[in-house]
């Protein structure tokens, strides 16, 4: 049975970990980094780049380099947050047929789960390379305050990436698992303050020893799914744009290339200002006008940055207060405050956390890795590799249905421990009503219109009766992933209608299947491309070897033999220009055979080690010779793309 990996699918960066010998291990990617930028780029020649390689080319390909896509996952196009993002990102956010926010790249419409799936595939490959075996199962984390549509969309992304998502768990809960696993200090209450690249969560969690078992119980959670490091970067970008406009009268917001360079610099400046008091943003040739090229040089102090983002930091205070109140505890009851997410490295954020909780936050948890580590531990729990751990998570928002007068009637209150089930009996609003529409909602507002619509379905064929007579039992069932299943049953007839909530938006089963097939086809393309590169490199090595040997020993051959080799060389060089693996392999083999005579001559004259462009000479056992040069594919070779 393969291992269940833990993936922190972040807005800005992602991370993967696995349980090994009873300990969680964060896995380094192919570039040697422990986190991978959650960036996906679509190149002109149809290649899809993920991670650092996508980030490196963002400046030259801004419209087709997608970052912070997690902020769009499970969201409608007309949501205020999405509209705000449209103004800030260089790529094109469009309205899909189902009213979701999708993205257009190189003339193709792409759903956010499809983009996130590319990041998950990179994480999957990272784990497979390390473990040396296929990985098919994962625990994926989401912000605690993600609603049902966003959780469902994240699960879809996992399926598209070829992963069976064994569990969706909340990021702060995962961080608490990472923090509390090795702590043997008895019962304690902790606050997890998670300010990441795109989302903010606060969870109050109780870690208790119950009959020798580590029990992690989430008491309350709150947050803001559109507040994070990306917003901090945006404030710096706005400031730089304003300063440049004051000085030069040019608005850089209209220049996609300049905007991408500003984004890079804003992120770097923000990071620098966590450890130094001031930094300078220098961007030569940022744009040009009739008078010539323009350069941007702006000094930013830590105090200036703090004034730019003060209101963003303040926005984290209210969710913290609500979570403490909902948990039914006092601030003084909290034993530890843990910081998660890269943005918590900012001194001003740490200061605010200290002010809210009246204690220094702990610094012994890695804010970038804790969530993936917790996901890996949960994977170990599900696999039975980690014993004596019980995780009790909650649903972040209340769930209910729309009733007469456009009111939301709640069936499950926020911060209810999951999995959970609740039912309530409703009736008809009109005489002889034969069908009812069950409109499922999520949120805290009294009126239905103020809450998130998760979907609706009908219960038909109700026998005609006076209003208020039929008894319709509505049941809400939340599974351990926090995903909702709803059913409605006419108690008189026993007729039942049920749905697994697939938001009125969201991807249909057919769309998910199509995307899974696309991803598989792409993986097959990558495999074929890799085989072609290998064939080209082997052919190039053979050509190089034969040419070298011909130069040194060609005079020992008869003219006929020489022209045979030269002809095979020419054919191999021509084959290299093609993109046909079979042709390249055939011509490589033909060249090896044609140069056979040359190899024989070299060996017979005691020149064996230098002469081997092709196969072993006849009569040799081959057991003790050095490797034949033409058969060695040097690791330094790169794909040879001869221009026609």
Curated annotation (Swiss-Prot):
It comes from the Bacteria. InterPro entries: ATPase_NBD (IPR043129), Chaperone_DnaK (IPR012725), Heat_shock_70_CS (IPR018181), HSP70_C_sf (IPR029048), HSP70_peptide-bd_sf (IPR029047), Hsp_70_fam (IPR013126). Residues 589-644 are annotated as: Disordered. Residues 604-619 have a biased composition (Low complexity). This is Chaperone protein DnaK. Belongs to the heat shock protein 70 family. Induction: By stress conditions e.g. heat shock. The keyword Thylakoid does not apply. GO terms for molecular function: ATP binding; ATP-dependent protein folding chaperone; unfolded protein binding. Gene3D superfamilies: 1.20.1270.10, 3.30.420.40, Actin, Chain A, domain 4 (3.90.640.10), Substrate Binding Domain Of DNAk, Chain A, domain 1 (2.60.34.10). It holds the Pfam family HSP70. Keywords: ATP-binding, Chaperone, Nucleotide-binding, Phosphoprotein, Stress response. The modification Phosphothreonine is found at residue 199. It comes from Nitrosospira multiformis (strain ATCC 25196 / NCIMB 11849 / C 71). Acts as a chaperone.
């Amino acid at each position: 049975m393969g291992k269940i990996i833990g993936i922190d699918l972040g807005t800005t960066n992602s991370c993967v970990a696995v349980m090994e010998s009873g300990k969680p291990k964060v896995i380094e990617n192919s570039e040697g980094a422990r986190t991978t930028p959650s960036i996906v780029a679509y190149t002109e020649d149809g290649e899809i780049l993920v991670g650092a390689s996508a980030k490196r080319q963002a400046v030259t390909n801004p419209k087709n380099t997608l970052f912070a896509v997690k902020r769009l996952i499970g969201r409608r196009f007309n949501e205020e947050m999405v509209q705000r993002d449209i103004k800030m990102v260089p790529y094109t956010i469009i309205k899909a047929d189902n009213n979701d926010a999708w993205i257009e790249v190189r003339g193709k419409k792409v759903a956010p789960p499809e983009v996130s799936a590319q990041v998950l595939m990179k994480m999957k490959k990272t784990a497979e390379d390390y473990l040396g075996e296929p990985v098919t199962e994962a625990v994926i984390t989401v912000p605690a305050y993600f609603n049902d549509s966003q959780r469902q969309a994240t699960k879809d992304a996992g399926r598209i990436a070829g992963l069976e998502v064994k569990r969706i768990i909340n990021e702060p809960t995962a961080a608490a698992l990472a923090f509390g696993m090795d702590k043997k200090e008895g019962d304690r209450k902790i606050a997890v303050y998670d300010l990441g690249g795109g989302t903010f969560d606060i969870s109050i969690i109780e870690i208790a020893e119950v009959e020798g078992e580590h029990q992690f119980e989430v008491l309350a959670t709150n947050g803001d799914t559109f507040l994070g490091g990306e917003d901090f970067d945006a404030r710096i970008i706005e400031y730089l744009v304003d300063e440049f406009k004051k000085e030069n009268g040019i608005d850089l917001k209209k220049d996609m290339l300049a905007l991408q360079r500003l984004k890079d610099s804003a992120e770097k400046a923000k990071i620098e200002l966590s450890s130094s008091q001031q930094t300078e943003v220098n961007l030569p040739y940022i744009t040009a006008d009739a008078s010539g090229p323009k350069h941007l040089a702006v000094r930013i102090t830590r105090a200036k940055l703090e004034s730019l983002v003060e209101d963003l930091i303040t926005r984290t205070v209210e969710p913290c207060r609500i979570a403490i109140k909902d948990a039914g505890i006092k601030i003084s009851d909290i034993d530890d405050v843990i910081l998660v997410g890269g943005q918590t490295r900012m001194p001003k954020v740490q200061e605010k956390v200290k002010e809210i909780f009246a204690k220094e936050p702990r610094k012994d948890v890695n804010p970038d890795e804790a969530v993936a580590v917790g996901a890996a531990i949960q994977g170990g729990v599900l696999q039975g590799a980690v014993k004596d751990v019980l995780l009790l998570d909650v649903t972040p928002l209340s769930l209910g249905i729309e009733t007469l007068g456009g009111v939301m009637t709640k069936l499950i209150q926020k911060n209810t421990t999951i999995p959970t089930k609740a039912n309530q009996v409703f009736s008809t609003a009109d005489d002889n009503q034969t069908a009812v529409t069950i409109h499922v909602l999520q949120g805290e507002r009294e009126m239905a219109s103020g809450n998130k619509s998760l979907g609706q379905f009908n219960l038909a064929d109700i026998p005609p009766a006076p209003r208020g007579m039929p008894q319709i039992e509505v049941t809400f069932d939340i599974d351990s992933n926090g995903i909702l299943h709803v059913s409605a049953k006419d108690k008189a007839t026993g007729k039942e209608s049920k749905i697994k909530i697939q938001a009125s938006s969201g991807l249909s089963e057919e769309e998910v299947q199509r995307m899974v097939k696309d991803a598989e086809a792409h993986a097959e393309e990558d495999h074929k491309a890799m085989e072609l590169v290998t064939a080209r490199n082997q052919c190039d090595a053979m050509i190089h070897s034969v040419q070298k040997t011909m130069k040194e020993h060609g005079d020992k051959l008869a003219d006929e033999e020489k022209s045979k080799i030269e002809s095979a060389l020419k054919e191999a060089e021509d084959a290299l220009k093609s993109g046909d693996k079979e042709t390249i392999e055939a011509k490589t083999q033909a060249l090896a055979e044609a140069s056979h005579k040359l190899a024989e001559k070299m060996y017979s004259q005691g020149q064996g080690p230098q002469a081997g462009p092709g196969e072993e000479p006849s009569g040799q056992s081959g057991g003790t010779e050095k490797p034949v040069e033409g058969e060695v594919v040097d690791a330094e070779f790169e794909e040879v793309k001869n221009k026609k």
